[in-house]
């Protein structure tokens, strides 16, 4: 199966500017291709990972990926998918974001076999007169107004700055084609108009038969119709500073049976036979969650590395078995970062007072005593039934945490101050 057919089987293609032309090109040569990354945040998120995964598939097949960090276009603001004008960030903020995202890309693609460039390097040198003479004359206002990204904003209003964004992105593609022989741009579903502008610019400046193509990925929806890529805590970031590898792992492990096979196709590098085998397990042995475990392992390995997979798996097994006393302090900090949390003093404390602190765990002393007597309270892995018991916060986890469980699954964390 060639790479285009594989991407179609995986459901990873929304549109192409010329599918047959692209397929024919790929049969005869290895190409360079690119994805643009917007540095308006310190980290990319799981939605950005879909086109990057396509780039990785091309890299694995011997093609050469190029990542364009939008240090220039990001300062202008992409109107795609936005209902209102973006707030422009200071250049020093962009510079920091560009640096962080560059490191994230290196983790995904390795140190060799790909290239990262910043479009600020060429866009910043483009003066207004050259912009208007060399490029502006090649773009029809009528066509630009019909692009979805512009048409959807005409009612609410769009600035000239954002209106010209598609020209700047087109200049990116032309520059990369001319200087680095890039022949394919990959982007999100909302980027099709911008990508088409780039292909058209190359055809006008180089020739109508020039082999330059665009490919977009679909908007990924869950089986319930909601947009994939959000959790209760917000975006699923790829930077471990904003979302721990364990939480990242858990996000994928917690996907439903209805969604997991689709996600295996889009986000993993497992082959068709392996995915179909996992699909059979979802159908015949869903309680084992083998497909979810494999999905979590594969995507976490791609983003954070094998060591992170092993650590996440270890924490998951310990929590599943209820053996929290075997966790290290650093593992506790990661595994319980999202549970209800209280702060306690660095001194021995009455167990009932601990349970009613800030009314987070128990609402009353009566309820706390009742749960203790009924064996419903576990502290640091040990069941506590003595209503007069005393807890020493220095005994476990380097004196930093106390883990409280009420019932079978409800966890709380006390941070020792």
Swiss-Prot record:
Positions binding L-tyrosine in this chain are 34, 165, 169
InterPro entries in UniProt: aa-tRNA-synth_I_CS, aa-tRNA-synth_Ic, Rossmann-like_a/b/a_fold, S4_RNA-bd_sf, SYY-like_C, Tyr-tRNA-ligase, Tyr-tRNA-ligase_bac-type, Tyr-tRNA-ligase_bac_1
Where ATP binds, per the record, is at: 230
Where do we find the motif 'HIGH' region here?
39-48
Q: Where along the sequence does the record place the motif called 'KMSKS' region?
A: 227-231
PROSITE patterns recorded: AA_TRNA_LIGASE_I, S4
- This chain's protein is named Tyrosine--tRNA ligase
- Compartments reported by the entry: Cytoplasm
Q: Which organism is it from?
A: Oenococcus oeni (strain ATCC BAA-331 / PSU-1)
Indicate the segments annotated as coiled coil, or none if absent.
none
Question: CDD domains annotated for this entry?
Answer: S4 (cd00165), TyrRS_core (cd00805)
